[in-house]
Amino acid sequence: MELLTNNLKFITDPFVCRLRHLSPTPSEEHMKNKNNVTEFILLGLTQNPEGQKVLFVTFLLIYMVTIMGNLLIIVTIMASQSLGSPMYFFLASLSFIDTVYSTAFAPKMIVDLLSEKKTISFQGCMAQLFMDHLFAGAEVILLVVMAYDRYMAICKPLHELITMNRRVCVLMLLAAWIGGFLHSLVQFLFIYQLPFCGPNVIDNFLCDLYPLLKLACTNTYVTGLSMIANGGAICAVTFFTILLSYGVILHSLKTQSLEGKRKAFYTCASHVTVVILFFVPCIFLYARPNSTFPIDKSMTVVLTFITPMLNPLIYTLKNAEMKSAMRKLWSKKVSLAGKWLYHS
């Protein structure tokens, strides 16, 4: 009997081994399905060839204006001793974030407008998602810091020089980047662990949360709620907190001189305009249930293209100190260039 059992085992073992090899475990099957999608197809803003050419020129100009405007602010603030206050330190930081934020998406989107095949690899899509929420998260916190700085400068000017020293400003900026990183990491991990087994078509010009949730081949209800809590709720609470702080600032202007009121009003108006431009699309896109709408593309354009382009214009339009510093700096540069050309 023992001999028969051993013989049967000898015969069946190779067969069982082959079956095990051919039949993947549930875990192996999950990983296979998860890795089915290696790239995503981006539909972009329009499928019309003529419309794509118009958009190519438009967004190329917007991107160039964004880069030049924000770099102009950064260079002017760094080179001008008169712009050494915390407000200008944070403004230069905001311009830097806007520059890298726009650069993370604009070049690919502009190139895709003239490309027949608009695809992005899975890894590239995840990198795009991470950068989107890293820069957006850092900007949200930085706008809060800028509101606090305006509160200190207008409501408690004697304490500002002590409280908002350079070390504190650097720590606040570092906190903004760390906060943006942690927020982005959470959103990234929520998406990265989802299985994507097809389809792979994203109706947008970049990879974002809800279009990706829509493509996941699993129930994403809980994941969607978690993302709302981590993204949309934070945006909404922060937005109304900033508006409330500016309400307090405007109320305190009753005791200011006429010139002080005018200067404070223009400073606050510029910042509130930037806050509204940034937070309204942010709240619309992320503080809602897991769903997508046709207007999402327009809101994403405002968030990633229009706001970074308008920020330099908004902050310099009514800012006499910035305009004066720019004139002095660039007249000096032109004068030096003229002397160099004359002697050469």
Curated annotation (Swiss-Prot):
Coiled-coil annotated residue ranges, if any: none
Disulfide-linked positions: C125-C217
Side of membrane Cytoplasmic, spans: 78-85, 149-167, 248-263, 318-344
GO cellular component, one term: plasma membrane
Keywords associated with the record: Cell membrane, Disulfide bond, G-protein coupled receptor, Glycoprotein, Membrane, Olfaction, Receptor, Sensory transduction, Transducer, Transmembrane, Transmembrane helix
Similarity-based family: Belongs to the G-protein coupled receptor 1 family.
Protein name, entry field: Olfactory receptor 4A15
Gene encoding the protein: OR4A15
